[in-house]
A protein has these predicted regions:
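Tandem repeat scaffolds
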Residues: 2-10, 16, 20-190
């Protein structure tokens, strides 16, 4: 279901009040809504309930998702540069062709999530929009993934150059064709 801009703005304003313990505040519950393509850079979605939300093609540069419930959310083609996902629930989340450069994913739960580049051959199977695309990498350059739970996560064709993977649990994770150059893998469970 697609949100109207007015309803979304009202929910975000009420959420900001809730975060600051102000009267009229209400925790955002935007689960299974669609905001595809919107410019949401710098917004604070900390501790919001956003399971299954469609953030595809959104500009989320610098957005804050600390401790947010993003179970099954779709961030395909989103710009998440410098976004903060500290301790967020990202189980089953999709990041097809997303830009996560310098994103903070400290202590996230990304079990069974997918961080993939999609080729034109398998694109239709994964992308509801059925658009044609050329193969691209998911950019996670210099991202902080320390202590993340990435058990059985699909992190195929990702550019993790210089990423902090300190104490990350990658048990069963698929890192095929990913660049791990200059990564800190100290204490990582591979």
């Amino acid at each position: 279901m697609s949100l109207t801009t007015q309803i979304f703005v009202e929910a975000v304003k009420a959420h900001q009040l809730w975060l600051n313990n102000k009267p009229g505040g209400k925790r955002a519950n935007l689960s299974y809504e669609t905001v595809s393509g919107l410019k949401l850079a710098g917004l604070n979605f900390s501790r919001a309930k956003m399971s299954g939300m469609d953030f595809s093609k959104c500009n989320l540069v610098g957005a804050n998702f600390t401790e947010a419930d993003l179970f099954g959310a779709d961030f395909s083609y989103a710009d998440l540069t410098k976004a903060n996902f500290t301790e967020a629930d990202l189980r089953g989340a999709q990041f097809f062709n997303a830009n996560l450069t310098e994103a903070n994913l400290h202590k996230v739960d990304l079990r069974h999530g997918e961080v993939l580049a999609v080729t034109s051959d398998d694109h239709q199977a994964h992308d509801k929009r059925k658009e044609k695309t050329r193969e691209r990498q998911v950019r996670m350059v210099a991202s902080n993934l320390s202590e993340a739970a990435m058990v059985n996560a699909a992190v195929s064709q990702a550019d993790l150059t210089g990423a902090n993977l300190h104490n990350v649990n990658l048990t069963g994770a698929n890192l095929s064709k990913s660049s791990l150059m200059d990564c800190d893998l100290t204490g990582a469970n591979l």
